[in-house]
Amino acid sequence: MTYVMLVGSDVALLEGLSQSLAGLGHRPSVCASIRDARDACVARPPLVLVVDRALASSAGAELLQLPVAAGGARILYRMASTPPLPLLPALQRVVLADLTLPLERHRLAALCQSVGERAKATGKAPRDTPEGLRAI
């Protein structure tokens, strides 16, 4: 199971994607803003971080500060009716894919699956340890 965080302002789209990813065995989480995502990422870094390109463009370097689990990936998305906004070169280098949703929702699911399998194969998959059993 891959922990996927979806960040964007289109709640209906993200909830639909969340349900689709959950149906495939992933553990999705939805955040409406970069600030909410930062708080959630600090508590538990996602293996896959999926962010609206408009938010990424306006957040700039702040998006680079969101922690991702070891072996994880950042993915950007935009709506088909929205032109792609410019990104910082540093952000362009760390993005695994730039998707047009909902058209490429199957590609998103495949990328989440691939990142999860790669993390398991390399030993970088996050382990779910119950709170009481964690070392200090």
Segments predicted by a language model, with ranges:
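As written
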Residues: 90-99
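Alpha2 helix of the CheY-like receiver
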Residues: 38-39, 109
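Conserved acidic carboxylate
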Residues: 7-8
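Conserved phosphotransfer microenvironments
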Residues: 38, 47-75, 79-87
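C-terminal output helix
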Residues: 99, 103-112
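CheY-like receiver
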Residues: 119-136
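Two-component/phosphorelay signaling modules centered on CheY-like receiver
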Residues: 11-30
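Conserved Asp/Asn-Gly motif in the active-site loop of CheY-like receiver
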Residues: 31-35
